Amino acid sequence: KEKLHITYNQLENLVNHFIDYLLNNFKKNELFKSPIAIHSSANLCSTISMLACAKLGITHCVLFNDLSKEAIEIRCKLIKCKILITASDDKDFTSKIKQIKKKLRIKVLRFSDSKNSNVSVNTDNFYKKKNIIKKFKYIFFESNKNSFILFTSGSTGEPKGIVHSTGGYLVYSKYTCSEKFNISDKTIILTASDAGWINGHTYALYGPLSLGATTIILEKPMMLLNPNILKEILFNL
């Protein structure tokens, strides 16, 4: 039940550090020609990854934590991704990813507090980064530029990737948060859905951040293993 408090300034710094990592460790055609897949949808790593991609104008696709190997593989194949970002240390998942990596010829970027050689970004060190790295300026895009892809469940056949544009999506995110939920920079919001679903994109991340609100992001396994955690959070807000 660890708590991590991140200010807007600290979040920007972490995003810039991750952008620097991406630009220094991957070729441009790997980063910009195909969408990036982001697994591990319920933690800070996915938040940083999503915002880094958005800032660089890289179309990204968040994959729900509990998807099977087959479900992950078909989504990676459909978007033709060359990079998969994950924060999972699960041994079973790691073996599955190795198979997907080999079959689809993708590179895997792993966030972890582990010290093993498969880890790309050590979170113990990464989250403690205090030094201010050069600020990466936001790039101006056409409003209809693809921002991210989110897949349907696939329960009625092959999953379908729903493309969300930069301008239209951000306008509706900010509008609904402001006008329907009365969210402002004084608001603390808890959206229990993770980024594997549209509510996690809109009401845990992009909408609240666009209005300067404080958003609480839950690591999903914590809630599933101990439902009292949700009650504890609500009583301590």
Question: Model-found features: residue ranges?
Answer:
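Flexible, low-complexity linker/hinge segments
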Residues: 116-145, 170-172
